[in-house]
Structure formats: C-alpha cells, structure tokens
C-alpha cells in the first residue's frame, strides 16, 4: 500500500489540519479517531503505461482543504499568502524508477496542474525507507512537503528496527491512500527454472545459491521472499538494495537470480522478454498478466502477499 502523508508537528495540530479532520482524514496521536475514512483507491494500469487516478479528485479536495487551513497558521505574512505560493515537494523514500517513485510522479503531475505550482520529487533512499521518512518528518508542517509512504515506512519498519528515526504515527498526518500493488516473482531468463515447482526443486538441491533482490530490508518485496522461504521450505539468499531500480538493473544483468518486486516496476521487462515472470504473489491472477499463475496455485498453497 502506498499513501500520501504530510509532516505533523505538535505545534501544528491546529491550523492547516483543522479542515482535514472535518473531511475525515485523521490526525494520529490525538484524541480524534485514528481510522481513516474510506477513500477511493488508485487503479494502476500498466498495459497502457497510464495510471487512472480514480481517487484523484478526492485527494485533491483534501489537499485543497489543507491549503485553506494554512491561512490560520501563526504569522501575518504567512496568513496573507495564498497557498500554494511556492513549489511543493513529495519525498519518496526509495530511488527513482521504482513503483513508489512512479506513483509520486503521477500524483505530482496532477497536483501541479490543479494547484498551479511545480511539484518536485525528492528521492531519499536507504534504510528501508527510514532515511526518507526522517527527512520528511523534519520538514515544516506547512503543506509544502508531502511524503509518499508505504506499508514498510509506516508499519513494518517499526517492528524491524530497534530505534526508528521518526514516529510513523505521531510525525505524519495521512491525506489519502494511493494504490495497492501486487508483487511479481521474476527471474533472469538465464536461470534454469521457469516455474515455481522447478524453482523450489532447484533451491532445495542448491541451498542458498538462489539470491533474490529487494528494494531494501523490510520492504514488502523482501518480506514476500522471506514468506516464500518459510512456506516453501527453501533457502533463498536476500540481497537488499536502496530501491527497486538498482535491484532490477542487477537482475537484468544476471547478478541476482530472482526478485519479488512491485508489478509496475518489472512488467515492461517481462513484456520485452528481458525478465521471466514466474508467479504473482496475490491470491488472484493479475489481469495484466492473466497467464501468469499465483504462487499459491503454482505450488505453495495459502501464499499471499502484496504491497
């Protein structure tokens, strides 16, 4: 899951966020309900290389409400300025080229058109998204810095790292959910297996020899691989990267054997024949690749994972 957040500081829990509460976007860490009201989700369609933002207008309405609220922040000069009066940044906690980056750039294009200001994408990769999260959390809560968070940065990392550099609940206010994305198990075509059963047999005959890349420790593709290890009773070796793009580059060069990655990041390479699609991690097949089986139906019953 990818979602759009804005930094939230204790001193700024009134003002720009008052209107957000009225629209149902919650302020975590306050006495208000911490449950986000349902928003329309993005439908990501890669076959035409376009994203149909079905929830775009609702997301923009939330951002517009944020803009309206900025007028009551302390400071007469700031109160008189129309929002947005300068470019807006979207911090992406992974390198350019991955799904989180793709989504941020698509959202940024729409925001720039609707709000009349440039939207700049800042890629701050590393530590499973924690570097970008810390960077965004320290930004001013003035509506000019947004954060494209993921299930990893806002949930999983808190269980994996002894000390988080930011509080994923108290330091951010959620604006809208952006997308749910399936993961795809892909292999370099030079690998000797083409199906899940063949890969399992090869992995059991060669423990630790199959290495799999991921966008970083704790990212959902990493956990997809570890879940496969546990359920298939094999030993795949994890190699973390600072984002999806460098991992895919090494996969294309056969420096790593396989990868569990978000569908949008790898499907162009599957369609060009540069990567081999083995299985999809969700419970149902993807309409984008209807001939590619799920991992569950291909030999690991009960397996299901997504980003």
Regions found by a protein language model. Give the residues of each.
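Hinge/capping helix and adjacent helix->loop/strand transition within the periplasmic-binding protein
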Residues: 138-143, 151, 159-246, 295-307
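Sec/Tat signal peptide C-region and signal peptidase I cleavage site
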Residues: 73-79
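C-terminal lobe and pocket-closing loops
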Residues: 194, 266-307
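N-terminal secretory signal peptides
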Residues: 3-12, 16-54, 61-72
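N-terminal (or domain-start) structured segment
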Residues: 79-170, 209-211, 217, 233-262, ...
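Short secondary-structure boundary segments
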Residues: 150-151, 189, 263-264, 282-283
